Amino acid sequence: MNLALEIVSIEGNIYFFIRTEERFKNLVETQMYSQYPTAEITEVEDYTKYVPKFEPGGAWECRAFEMKLDKEDAIPIKTYIDFGMDSKSLSLDEEQKIDPMTPLIEMMSSLKAGEQLWMQIFVRGAGKSLKLNETSGVVTFFKHLFGEKEDYLHLSDDKGGSQDWQAQGRKYIDKLLDEHSSTIIGEGEKAKKVGGYKNLPPDKKDLVDRVERSIMKFGFDVGIRVVYYAKKENFNGGRCPSEVTSAMRQFAAPKSASYNSLAMNADTFTNGLDFPWQDWNNMRAYKAQKKMFELYVKRAYYYPPATSKKD
């Protein structure tokens, strides 16, 4: 089951959309109503149809980029617990609670006439590495394809879809513990270090606890894409990426090793060239802008026409 959760600002008016397959419509609505009983859900036309397609030299300007995690996948960003939104924090006064969406919504609501900002968050269940019985015909096929290597059991689509994310988390914890282990028990091949956790500094202990809590939950492959689309006379270059990335900083704690952060993937930024001679007549920028616009409209991220990218 794949979903596209979309937050859209059309001239400062904020809308929330969920893009899914028809067969999952009732499931999505049921889950929404169970959490938000007073919510109003309406099936609507695709809002991207109400603006002209991006064309170089046209009346509209486009900037777009995708986001990535700044650190290893195993390190989580801030979650509802950190914002005092879990059951243990229900006793907090309203003024003590933090709504993590506020900076983003405030920024998006500041858009003027002729400006639109679209953000789509792709979600699908996180898969694991391929684990099949050695007698399986599929394994035999992969052996024929890749040879007698262990790699054929760890295929990855570079979007994280077939990685064992829980094993990655445990491996990361083991790495931290090993770095702070001091006592060796046993000899030879049976020797191992112990005492790692108690030797960890406070921020590293907090990090281990957060990673452990993260891998105990359901995992999801997530991708974030942002498009800023505006008429040329209304275009504000400061909106994207600066204002968007600034509005996402509340999910990180820059001075703490316990948190990951969301950052712009510079390889996907449509206007990422620094000097005029790198892009004669803006041909490369126009091509990138048109591609990102089309990928957004098609909701393509995990599969073609999107291409797999590292990070």
Identify the meaning behind each predicted range:
Residues M1-D311:
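Extended, folded cores of ATP/NTP-driven motor/assembly subunits in large transport
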